Curated annotation (Swiss-Prot):
Species: Halorubrum lacusprofundi (strain ATCC 49239 / DSM 5036 / JCM 8891 / ACAM 34)
Gene name as annotated: trmY
The entry's keywords: Cytoplasm, Methyltransferase, S-adenosyl-L-methionine, Transferase, tRNA processing
Domain of life: Archaea
GO biological process, one term: tRNA methylation
Protein name, entry field: tRNA (pseudouridine(54)-N(1))-methyltransferase
Enzyme Commission identifier(s): 2.1.1.257
SUPFAM superfamilies listed in its UniProt record: alpha/beta knot
Subcellular location(s) of the protein: Cytoplasm
Binding sites annotated in the UniProt record for S-adenosyl-L-methionine: L137
Subunit structure: Homodimer.
Function: Specifically catalyzes the N1-methylation of pseudouridine at position 54 (Psi54) in tRNAs.
Amino acid sequence: MRQFVVIGHDVPTDPDAISLSDIPGAGRLDLLCRCVAAGVFLSHGIRERVRVHLVVADEFTVTFDADSLRHLHPDERNVAARIRDALDAQDDAIGHMPADVSPGVELRRMGLEATLDRVLDTPGTSSASADPTLVQLHEDGDPLVDAAPPTDPVFVLSDHNDFAPAERDLLADRAERRVRVGPELLHADHTVSVVHNWLDTDGYESY
């Protein structure tokens, strides 16, 4: 399984503060929507065995599970509406029990650290790997092309902001690798696409 944990620092937790007419104005929610689309969609379908976790204001995590998604479209407005619905269900997220928003979409009352604990404590889905591998995507990391693709990776990346000091400390302690996808800085959603391509083409010699 491939998993992406995207940190949204400025997205409001109040669903009433999210306007579908001004998605970027909701703490650059548009960027998180594009990360979801890049994470779960193919040209004419949905990927298998992919999850995207959006950490909102280090308070809630909205999870999109590609294997269970229904009636989700790749446009920003559709994804933003699903995120807003998730935040609207926050009263149903009690403790670490999720609120079921729609097929394939859940909201948990968890920040980054608790989300990483939960994701990393879930055994990998490949017989070749017992545990997921946490990989931080960062401009100061090692070149992606020099790294061997992990079997059950969990990639952590930030939105348009850099990682906060506490996030950097947490990832320095928990991440097994820190990699950079290329020589130029990319938007978070483009980074997700590059990582997918890296994993998709591993072992391919011809197309």
